Amino acid sequence: MKTFGRVLTAMVTSFNNDGSVNIENCVAIANHLLDNGSDGLVVCGTTGENPTMSRDEKLALFNAIAKECGHKGSIIANVGSNDTMASAEFVKEVSKIDGIDGLLVVVPYYNKPNQQGQYLHFKTIAEATTLPIMVYNVPSRVGTGIFPTTLVQLHNEYPHICAIKEASGNLMIASEIKRLMPGDDFMVYSGDDGLTLPMLSIGGCGVVSVVSHIAGKDMNAMIQAYESGHNYKAIRIHQALSEIIKAMFITTNPIPVKYAARKIGLPVGKFNLPMCEPTADEEAYIDKALAEYLK
C-alpha cells in the first residue's frame, strides 16, 4: 500500500510572545520530528493550535515547511473548517504550494451537518483540488461524525479522497470502513495514539500521532514490528508506550505535548489562549512519564 507513511506527527506550532507564529522555530521542530521517527507531518492541525492562526500565517508555515522539510517526508496541510466555501477557496491557495503532499479536512464542527451536508462539504472541497485528501473524523471535538457509507460514496466519486484520520475511538467504525473498502487505495490512520496497534490489526496503515513528538522512533518501531509479523515485539512496545500516551492526554491536547516538547528542548514557545499551561498536578504527572525520555 502506498501511504503518506507510518507515523505522521500532528506537530505543535511555535508562537512568539505576541502570539504570532515563529516560522524558524517551527521548521526546526519539523526537522527534529522527521529525523526522529516521523515519516510525515500534519501542519496547522488541532495540535498546532490552528484556530489561533491567521490565514496568512498558515500559508506562510505551509510554504516554509514544504520548502525546508518536504524532502524528508510527507507534508499534510490541515485546511478544514466549518465554512465549506471558505475551505474550498483556501484549498485552492494551498494546492499551489510546491511540496504539499496532501490535505487534512475535518468534518465540519459546531454546525453539525447531517450526512448529506457532510457529503456536499467534502465534494465541494474535492472539486477544488487534485491533491490527496485525508478526512478527519473526530466526533468528540466536532459534535458529529462521518458514516462509513458516506466515506465510501465520496471515495468512489472522488478517488483522491483516499484516507481518513479515524479519531472516534470506536474501532468498529474503522473496521467497517475496511470491510467496505478492503483494497489498498484507501488508507485508514488511527487518530488515537493508544489505538494504533489495534487499528493495524483491522487494516489500518499507521497513526496521526501526538506522542511521536516524544517517542516517534518507538511508535514507528511498533508499526514496523507488526508489519514484519513480530506481533509480540509490537505488543511490548505498545505496552511500554502506555504511560507516555496517558500523560499526553491527561488534559486537552496540545497542552501536555507542548509542555513535554519544551522539556526535551524543542523551541515550542508559548500557548495561545484559550490553550494555557498545565496545572501543577498535570505537570507532575507528565514529568513522571517523561523521565524515561530525558535519560
Indicate where each model-derived feature is located:
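C-terminal alpha-helical cap/extension of soluble enzyme domains
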Residues: 7-14, 32, 36-38, 93, ...
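Secondary-structure boundary/capping signal
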Residues: 73-74, 133, 162, 185, ...
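Alpha-helical structural signal in soluble globular domains
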Residues: 36, 60, 64-69, 93-97, ...
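Active-site beta->alpha loop and helix N-cap motifs at the rims of alpha/beta catalytic domains
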Residues: 2-9, 14-143
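Glycine-rich phosphate-binding "P-loop"
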Residues: 137-138, 161, 272-273
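Basic/polar N-terminal segments that are highly enriched at the extreme N-terminus
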Residues: 1-2, 295
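A general structural signal for well-ordered alpha-helical segments in protein cores
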Residues: 26, 58, 62, 87, ...
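Catalytic alpha/beta core domains of metabolic enzymes, predominantly
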Residues: 127-128, 141-249
